Swiss-Prot record:
It comes from Rhizobium etli (strain CIAT 652). NAD(+) binds at residues 44-48, 93-94, 127, 150, 186, 302, 326. Belongs to the NAD-dependent DNA ligase family. LigA subfamily. The active site is at residue 129. This is DNA ligase. GO terms for cellular component: cytosol.
Amino acid sequence: MSTEGSAVDTLTIEEAAAELERLAKEIAHHDALYHGKDQPEISDADYDALKRRNDALEARFPELIREDSPSRHVGAAPSVTFSPVVHARPMLSLDNTFSQEDVQDFVAGVYRFLGRLPDQSIAFTAEPKIDGLSMSIRYENGRLVTAATRGDGTTGENVTANIRTIAEIPNELPKGVPAVVEIRGEVYMAKSDFLALNRQMEAEGKQTYVNPRNTAAGSLRQLDAKVTASRKLKFFAYAWGEMAEMPADTQFGMVQTFKDWGFPVNPLMKRLNSVADILAHYDEIGLERPDLDYDIDGVVYKVDSLELQQRLGFRSRSPRWATAHKFPAEQAFTEVEKIEIQVGRTGALTPVARLKPITVGGVVVTNATLHNEDYIKGIGNSGERIRPEEHDIREGDTVIVQRAGDVIPQILDVVMEKRAADARSYEFPKTCPVCGSHAVREVNEKTGKTDSVRRCTGGFICRAQATEHLKHFVSRNAFDIEGLGSKQVDFFFENEDPSLQIRTAPEIFTLEKRQQDSLTKLENIDGFGKVSVGKLYAAINERRSIALHRFIYALGIRHVGETTAKLLARSYGTYEAFATAMKEAAPLSGEAWTDLNAIEGIGEVVARAMVEFYKEPRNVEVIGRLLDEVTPAEAEQPVTAGSPVAGKTVVFTGSLEKFTRDEAKARAESLGAKVAGSVSKKTDIVVAGPGAGSKLDKARELGVQTMDEDEWLALISG
């Protein structure tokens, strides 16, 4: 059962460990999208909520802090497209504050750490938090030599050639500057330039950009510096990395020095002493925000004295002497013109509000997700009422729209005073709008709870599900067919030419053969070419033999993710054994059903979803055709005979020096061990490298066997 919405103080240690594992993976996923690809899929507010949940769990269960915890890392791994640059000093993130009370606590914490009374003797700087791309620019002997993105905080991407195209960034500094100077700041795109660029894109019939921040980041990562130069990027300097000598002894003085050296600095930066003045400046900047020609998402406060900054020091990923006071999400009023239903890969019917275009935070909003049937009625996922009963969302309603975290729009409430007298409640469809199949809300037999999502039962016969299923089938953790991405799948799916059409997975593997006898050659179609088509065929043929767990995952069975697919592959060994077991488990009773539920990590909900999938004749028919083209390899079984760690639960902690964590995990699993992320009474062995902390302490407290890497290697090699 998910503990996602449960209060932290009600969780058991096992539940907390499981949720910390989920949060680590989820936050890492969103970090990669935001910092690495500039394509966030959740709002800043939702992301901050995930981080706060993680921090709260770690505060209550410090012994469960993971090596891959979000509290220990910044940003995401740098892209392989640009050469890596190791920062001379790490580029850390800032802790966030969200209320006046949080700011008061931050200031009080500074005084408390320094052993002082809060007598307003400590000055702070306050400046807008620019919503752009963090940058570190290195000068040696006054000349610009390197510019790098934040990356993961330790290693960034070398974008020197592109940075040189930004007119506001000097290529040379005045005489007399220190021998080594690293200027840090934010690259951004002005709102006016962003709107002009989108007008140009519209005039050329091209897709417009979403917001200035993503556009600036994408522009800076262009392989052709001429493209970057055409985007009119700008820069604000506000910090520094390595400095051969310090030209000032305060934060404010350093930034003023940057201005003297020719860098643009933010004119709204102030030096203040009291919490009241700090909060007043926050309000002033908030009032000016709509009129600024650049996006900001908060105000940054820093202790002004560099000596005090040094005494205050750092936490694992952020300084104690600074915090970012975030703005609440921006809101606006608009009209719901229509409610439409989208159908996803698993058949979920998701309502989307088509809105009368409205600008919120510099971005034109035309759509908002309505999540599910209950959300339209004002009911949350746990059955709680989130709006008054009469505030259901109807077509024609005037609504309050919020860009939470300035990314994803959502409807907060209905303005009842403007509701038309003849406005009718929205009737959620009971059939799929794409294929006409029944759409049902499943009931959990154990809990009796009705799923908040209504799903199409059409499976592969539903065009919407079929398209999304194909995209899942070729995705990175499934068949991973290079050259067959989302756009290509849409092209082949919608094509009416029999030699080009791909509507089920088996047709991917017959494409080349069908093309041989066709007059319509793929290589002659816009967007393709002889070389790219050849590479596509080669990539497809490479996947005619595939690992069993990838094959199972690619089938797109509901609830069967990558980890579950690996468990199934290891348990059954061959696809034939797996498919036979699913067929024999169909009555939801008997030996096959019992064995399926006995697999660790497979609960009744997952087991039932798999059995139901194989009950559908259409699914079995498609898989049969797929097996004519593809051979799932027999799963490699752990070598447990004579293995000293077979059946044991192992935890790796600290900095491993002789192998990577993935290598250590793979080796342990190949010997029949289970690798866990946290220490508990069920743990058998803890392998501790340098820097091992709370997990090692917990192991000793519980009497769990501990060893270093050499002892571990001796154990598994003996």
